[in-house]
Amino acid sequence: MNGQMNISRRTALKAAGAGLIVAGTGAGGLVYGHNEAWAATAENLDADTFATLVQMSRDTYPHDRLEDKFYAAAVSGLDKAAKDDGALKTMLTDGVAGLNKAAGGAYSGVTDADKRTALLKAIENDGFFQKVRGNLVTGLYNNKEAWPLFGFEGASADQGGYLERGFNDINWL
C-alpha cells in the first residue's frame, strides 16, 4: 500500500450525499450547512438557490477533504456577480428551478448521489451548468485556504520557482 487512497468519483458523491445541505434562512438571507459548521450570506440570490448551488458545486467537483464552506465561498462569487448582472441572476435562478423540477423536488434534498449525478449529466452542456462549473475552477481552486487540503504549497515564482524549491516534493501528482 502506497499510503494514498483511491476514491472514485461515485464513492465521493455517495459520501457527499450523506451530508446534504439543508438551507436555513436567517436575517439577510443567511444560508447555513446541515450542522451549521459553515454559513454564508446570500445577498442577491435567495437562500434556497444559494444552497442548491453549493450542493451542485460539491457534486460537480467532489473532494472529501473540503468542507462545504469552500464550496459556499465559490458560490458567493456568483452571488456577488449577480448583483450587477441581471442576466446572470436570471440564469442561476432559472437553472436551479429547472434542476429542482427535473429532480421532482429540491435538488439539494435528493439523497441518492447517482440520481444527482444523472441530473447534472443531463444539463452538462447547458450554459447554466457551464457557468457554475467554470466559476468553481477559479472560485474553488484559487482559494488559498483550500490549497493545503490539496497538498499544494502555493505559488513559487516569488520564491525562486519550483526548480529552486524542490519541484518534485509533491506527493499528489
Spans of features found by a protein language model:
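N-terminal secretory signal peptides and thylakoid transit peptides that target proteins
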Residues: 2-21
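Residues marking the start of alpha-helices
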Residues: 3, 41, 106-107
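C-terminal segment of N-terminal export signals and the immediately downstream linker at the start
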Residues: 7-11, 24-63
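Mature-region segments of soluble proteins
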Residues: 51, 55, 70-173
